[in-house]
């Protein structure tokens, strides 16, 4: 459904707004990378297994296990030790996940005012950190031992952050453009 919206509405709106000479210049979403780590429980093999199972439930795709690049004595971490999991979503699974994220998961975030409008890099990619994975309907609250959170990176073909932000806005991603101060939060 989101894919059809992109093709029918978003492409034409972006062509008008940014004056592209060809439809092929319009930015599109290449892939979505979802990453989750076990955090403090990296030494616990059951926690790693739980991370991989949760990622499978959330994304509908089997994750691959991520490992530590360097040893770190403070975290009791050795090189090549399992840390979590990562999934790269493309094509239909990517569109399905993005639609679920925008329409189901984000409205369930407590005190949510919109995604950070500054979370774009210079190449137009968007990064979103989610503190609780229980916002996804596939995760049962009673079955998780501890909230681990996850990272969602949306990789686009946009040349600038402005183009990428507009693309995601037209797809329905809510952004927090207002500057919240401590007084307005009270």
UniProtKB/Swiss-Prot annotation:
Give the lineage. Bacteria, Bacillati, Mycoplasmatota, Mycoplasmoidales, Metamycoplasmataceae
Sum up the protein's function in the record's words. Answer: This is one of the proteins that bind and probably mediate the attachment of the 5S RNA into the large ribosomal subunit, where it forms part of the central protuberance. In the 70S ribosome it contacts protein S13 of the 30S subunit (bridge B1b), connecting the 2 subunits; this bridge is implicated in subunit movement. Contacts the P site tRNA; the 5S rRNA and some of its associated proteins might help stabilize positioning of ribosome-bound tRNAs.
Q: Which Pfam families match?
A: Ribosomal_L5 (PF00281), Ribosomal_L5_C (PF00673)
Q: What Gene3D superfamilies does this protein's entry cite?
A: 3.30.1440.10
Q: What is this protein called?
A: Large ribosomal subunit protein uL5
Domain of life of the native organism: Bacteria
On subunit structure and binding partners, the annotation says: Part of the 50S ribosomal subunit; part of the 5S rRNA/L5/L18/L25 subcomplex. Contacts the 5S rRNA and the P site tRNA. Forms a bridge to the 30S subunit in the 70S ribosome.
One GO cellular component from the entry?
Answer: ribosome
- Record family assignment: Belongs to the universal ribosomal protein uL5 family.
InterPro entries in UniProt: Ribosomal_uL5, Ribosomal_uL5_bac-type, Ribosomal_uL5_C, Ribosomal_uL5_dom_sf, Ribosomal_uL5_N
Record-level Gene Ontology MF annotations: rRNA binding; structural constituent of ribosome; tRNA binding
Tell me the gene name.
rplE
Task: Enumerate the UniProt keywords alphabetically.
Answer: Ribonucleoprotein, Ribosomal protein, RNA-binding, rRNA-binding, tRNA-binding
